[in-house]
Amino acid sequence: MPTPDPFVSATASLLFPGLLARAQATDEGAWKPFRAGVDILALYSTPDGHSAALLRYQPGAVVAHHLHVGFEHVLIISGTQIDPRGEHRAGTLVVNPPGSDHQVTSPGGCVVLAIWERPVEFTGN
């Protein structure tokens, strides 16, 4: 799958054929380091802050405490992700509203599709 243009118009239509296969691929390709133990494959971003990406958590990865200033939608594609609301398994859609905050872990590793209305603000290490 070609690397998408990182910035797109808010009115552009985008298609990502083979996205689930790409999420499960073990080759590094377009995956980049994001946080310790977490890689990111950016799908798109717009000048006003909307963005989406695949995130690949290695076993034991922790994403530091952060605040959501816009909606975040997270679809767990494989594995399990844990936040203060509980353990979220593959197939679960997690919606974090503006003003919510949390820390996320994945003891066994996982891959998620994350869609952000606005960038998150990291408040912890």
PLM region descriptions:
Residues 35-68, 87, 97-101:
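Conserved short histidine dyad/triad with adjacent acidic residue
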Residues 82-106:
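Short acidic-glycine-tyrosine-enriched beta hairpin
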